[in-house]
């Protein structure tokens, strides 16, 4: 789920810069392939599983100097037999360089092979629409996102900040922070018997702090290790603590790490 709507501001603003250049008469379709590992799969502050391997394929096409259409398919699977968690996401988005900011709108379909919470608990699918705005504010990049989930009829708002520091010609350090907020019970409380969302409150979900180290291996390939720390808000404390109590791997406040490889062509 996270790779659909948690695009970093750096990526969005880079796309905007490219959009300002003159587009060719027939813009080609650009593809990217990614694969990675997460020690913990945490999405929007909620712990899902651990020891996850994931794969992503994306495609994008410039429709005009200022507009880009993109699609992607993302799959993640836990290698821990306690959760047996698997997820497939399919998404489409349209980004527009409005000058003052990069504006995006998208749709995502989520399929949960063994239930939203794994182990057969929870719904098997969800779908959402979202809008976001990305802009450089002073020394940092900022992205504001709001998404509405049709399955639970609740929304999620997020503010993300990131700053990149060049280390060498091929390596940079990216420091990022995110804060999420549930609007109307966005997966804030679950029925213990069915795993279905029964939350209704509007509360903070989490704060996420992350440091990543993108390393350019070539002009088209990048390797990125990262470390992160998730701090549960009121909308995540009970669920994440329950995963910890069940000895599944989740914690209220949790350190995790991972790495990914990405190639574009």
Predicted features and spans:
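Mid-chain, structured segments of secreted extracytoplasmic proteins
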Residues: 74-106
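Flexible, solvent-exposed coil segments and beta strand-coil junctions
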Residues: 34-38, 67-73, 135-143, 189-194
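Cleavable N-terminal export/targeting peptides
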Residues: 1-30, 66
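Outer-envelope beta-barrel architecture signal
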Residues: 25-33, 51-53, 65-69, 88, ...
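Outer-membrane beta-barrel translocator/channel fold
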Residues: 75-83, 106-129, 138, 145-156, ...
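Short stretches within intrinsically disordered, low-complexity N-terminal or propeptide regions
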Residues: 16-19, 135, 223
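Residues on the lipid-exposed face of transmembrane beta-strands in outer-membrane beta-barrel proteins
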Residues: 35-37, 55-61, 90-96, 107, ...
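Short glycine/proline- and aromatic-enriched beta-strand/turn motifs that initiate or cap beta-hairpins
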Residues: 22-64, 68-79, 262
């Amino acid at each position: 789920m996270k790779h659909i709507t948690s695009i970093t501001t750096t990526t969005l603003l880079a796309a905007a810069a490219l959009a300002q250049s003159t587009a060719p008469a027939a813009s080609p379709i650009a593809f990217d392939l990614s694969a990675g590992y997460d020690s913990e799969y945490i999405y929007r502050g909620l712990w899902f599983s651990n020891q996850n391997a994931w794969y992503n394929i994306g495609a994008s096409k410039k429709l005009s100097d200022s507009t880009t259409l993109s699609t992607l398919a993302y799959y993640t699977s836990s290698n821990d037999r306690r959760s047996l968690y698997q997820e497939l996401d399919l998404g489409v988005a349209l980004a527009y360089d409005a000058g003052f900011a990069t504006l995006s709108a998208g749709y995502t379909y989520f399929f949960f092979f063994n239930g939203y919470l794994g182990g057969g608990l929870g719904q098997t699918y969800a779908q959402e629409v979202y809008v976001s705005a990305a802009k450089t504010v002073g020394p940092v990049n900022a992205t504001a996102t709001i998404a509405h989930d049709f399955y639970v009829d609740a929304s999620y708002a997020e503010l993300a900040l990131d700053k990149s520091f060049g280390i060498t010609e091929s390596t940079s350090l990216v420091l990022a922070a995110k804060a999420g907020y549930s609007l109307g019970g966005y997966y804030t409380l679950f029925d213990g018997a069915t795993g279905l969302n029964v939350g209704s409150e509007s509360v903070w979900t989490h704060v996420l702090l992350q440091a990543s180290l993108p390393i350019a291996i070539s002009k088209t390939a990048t390797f990125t290790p990262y470390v992160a720390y998730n701090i549960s808000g009121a909308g995540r404390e009970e669920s994440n603590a329950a995963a910890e109590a069940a000895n599944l791997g989740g914690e209220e406040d949790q350190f995790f790490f991972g790495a990914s490889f990405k190639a574009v062509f």
